[in-house]
A protein has these predicted regions:
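Predominantly soluble domains enriched in secretory-pathway, periplasmic, or organellar proteins
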Residues: 17-471, 482-487, 500-502
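Bacterial N-terminal signal peptides
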Residues: 1-10
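Membrane-proximal cytoplasmic juxtamembrane segment of single-pass cell-surface glycoproteins
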Residues: 495-498
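A cross-kingdom C-terminal cell-surface attachment/processing module
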Residues: 476-493
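Sec/Tat signal peptide C-region and signal peptidase I cleavage site
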Residues: 12-15
Length: 502
């Protein structure tokens, strides 16, 4: 019996080791080169045992995602278990601010938007707005003016079954300017290209929230619609014993992207029988799910007429022509349709976040189980190189000039994680600088189409500048005064010259 127990314990340990790959901690200076590009690890922010002091940052605690500001000046790292977002200078990589998510009912009441009817509390009744928030993903709106950061859950809601929340940061000051309710367990958030809508995807119960943000004034934003993907997942879990909400959460809605014309919203389904949910934004109605790609769809990106997917478990990047995908989506007869013709490229196991270089030629994929950053050439759909990342990478962003890639790594159990890796990329063929399209259109409303202008945008120009950008107004006034002085001086000299000639 003792021998059998020993054998069983040994087998259990072996299986555990096999399920969690060995931890990797590459040194700064690690590099990889191919004919198309070279990539080098140039900096880190880490907080694990044995960390080099020069790279240690105590605020890095299970970093979920990173977002580089569209102007390239700084980047934001969402520290999920730290209940904070850490802000770094893009040039020096020094920490410049920590945004903490600790709220109290009365103290922070003014930050909350007007509640909607979409998100009722069904389990908790007291001190609902006293909590700490666990930041997940984020997206910019209004040309980079605001950063939207959903919370995995409110800390008292141990099983993420009541409404969570989303914080909005003014990136000029890096202060919280608005809090809004969400559905349970929001993970992904996306802004439409025209800047009018923010979509919040609720992993926790198969729903997607739509927020109207067409105004420049955060006080005028409001919840517009709550959409259901097939069915609302019933939530009635324990209030004292925590369960695993990262699994068995219905369709586990994740990757979220608006089509370039903003007519449709696509949402990846990591769970259930998978696929991509399609929402018609003109009618704000759920159309059904497109199947046919590999299971376990994690992240979605649209670029140059293609829809790209990361396939988590199998470790693939897939793509298909967006027109072909939308044709299938529009012909859904019932709840699902199956689409064939996907192009595949195998990368590392556990493909999570993907982003594409400014030229559209390269896909960068954070591969969790492989502890690597993979690069795929979209012209051939083949891997061109890969490089080690601190275990286990999940989040990723690329700068608008393609020069820097930032990767965040969470742990698996008590292993790995607590790391942010910064890579510098040099391309054989120069990359263009990507145009800022983060909801920028809302800042340039069409003057010849009054129906598309919002009340808050139709204010007098000077009043609007004063309200939203006082520094710019002072510059305008100063320039005007200098011009006036110059004109007066010119006229006086001209008059004096005329008198002499006479």
């Amino acid at each position: 019996m003792i021998l059998l127990c020993a054998l069983w314990m040994g087998l259990t340990r072996a299986m555990a080791q096999q399920s969690t790959p060995s931890v990797v901690h590459p040194n700064v200076g690690t590099s990889s080169t191919s004919d198309q590009l070279s990539i080098k690890l140039v900096n880190k922010h880490i907080n694990y045992g044995g960390s080099q002091e020069q790279y240690r940052d105590a605020y890095i605690n299970s970093p979920k995602s990173a977002n580089i500001h569209p102007d390239g000046s700084k980047y934001y790292v969402n520290s999920l278990e730290g209940c904070a977002t850490v802000v770094y200078d893009m040039k020096t990589h020094k920490r410049i601010k920590v945004i903490h998510y600790k709220f109290e009912d009365e103290k922070d009441a003014a930050l909350w938007s007007k509640p909607s009817e979409f998100y009722p509390f069904t389990h908790y009744t007291e001190h609902l707005n006293t909590f700490m928030g666990k930041p997940v993903e984020s997206t910019f709106s209004h040309g980079g003016r605001y950063l939207w950061i959903p919370f995995y859950r409110r800390t008292y809601d141990i099983n993420a079954q009541d409404p969570s929340a989303i914080a909005v940061i003014d990136t000029r000051t890096d202060e919280i300017v608005k809090l809004m309710e969400t559905g349970p367990l929001p993970k992904m958030v996306a802004c439409s290209h025209d800047g009018r809508h923010v979509a919040i995807t609720h992993w926790g119960n198969n729903t997607v929230g739509i927020v109207n943000v067409a105004s420049l004034n955060p006080d005028e934003w409001y919840h517009e619609k709550l959409l259901v993907v097939d069915y609302v997942l019933p939530l009635n879990f324990s209030l004292t014993q925590q369960i695993d909400r990262d699994n068995k959460s219905g369709y586990c809605l994740r990757g979220t992207v608006f089509t370039p014309d903003d007519k449709y919203l696509l949402v990846g389904c990591m769970g259930g029988n998978g696929g991509i949910a399609v929402i018609d934004m003109s009618t704000q109605k759920y159309m059904g799910r497109v199947l046919g790609m590999m299971a376990n769809v994690r992240h979605l990106v649209i670029r140059d007429g293609y829809l790209y997917l990361s396939i988590n478990k199998a470790g693939y990047v897939q793509r298909i022509k967006l027109d072909k995908f939308m044709q299938a989506a529009k012909n859904i007869n019932g709840k699902t349709t199956t689409l064939s013709g996907w192009e595949n490229c195998q990368v590392g196991a556990g493909a999570r976040t993907i982003e594409i270089s400014p030229s559209g030629h390269f896909v960068f994929a954070a591969c969790n189980l492989a502890s690597k950053l993979y690069v795929v050439d979209t012209r051939t759909m083949k891997v061109v190189t890969n490089i080690d990342v601190d275990s286990y990478p999940v989040g990723l962003d690329i700068s608008n000039d393609g020069r820097f890639v930032i990767v965040t790594s969470q742990g698996r159990g008590n292993s790995g994680g607590n790391a942010v890796n910064i890579y510098e990329v040099e391309y054989t063929e120069p990359e263009p600088v990507m145009e800022n399209t983060d909801g920028a259109a809302v800042l340039n409303m069409l003057k010849d189409d009054p129906s598309k202008q919002q009340a808050s945008v139709e204010k007098d120009n000077i009043a609007t500048v004063l309200e939203h950008d006082g520094d710019s107004l002072l510059l305008y006034i100063g320039a005007g005064l200098l011009a006036a002085v110059a004109v007066v001086a010119f006229l006086m000299r001209r008059r004096k010259g005329a008198q002499i000639r006479n």
